[in-house]
Amino acid sequence: EVVYDDESMAGYMKAAVGVTPDRPILIDRFLNHAMECEADAISDGTHAFVPAVMEHIELAGVHSGDSACILPSVHISEENLETIKEYTRKIAEEMHVKGLMNMQYAIEDDKVYVLEANPRASRTVPLVSKVCNVRMVPLVTQIITSELTGKPSPVPELKEQAIPYYGVKEAAFPFNMFQEVDPVLGPEMRSTGEVLGLSKSYGEAFYKAQEG
């Protein structure tokens, strides 16, 4: 729930149910007009590799599953891209993640904020694997089974590659089937699927995703 003033906050608190010391209400400051982005990482517990950063088209506040995103990023500065990759690597290494990890960020006034660190596979893994030509799942399987197979971690050998086209992920919504669902997007996920548009043109990739 996003509230914008004291009156809305008071109304929400009155309507909240099941609030106990063990089930508190968590409050975060909302970043106004912030750009949201995310990054997936492959980590072996010591080293981490970030193939690319995905830029959300909708502003922060829309659930990442409902937001369209573009890969590689179009509007994020090189400095912020490097910051995001560095944060992702350091957090994965500090948490000793062995496998996949997804990080979500917001950028407000040219400052990068960490929103979430999820040490698990994300729905964006197929997108990143396809667009970046990185076989993320087989690589992670090799990491997880390394103690059984004796094979070394592939992470130190992974290098970021130039992406020759754009990939746009767009969410698929069930509003035509469930007409009672509020179509206004927010922090609660409403999509039931997604599609990918590919093109050497950002605009055409977005168009293909909309058509899909």
Q: Model segments located where?
A:
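ATP-dependent carboxylate activation and anion-phosphoryl transfer catalytic cores
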Residues: 1-212
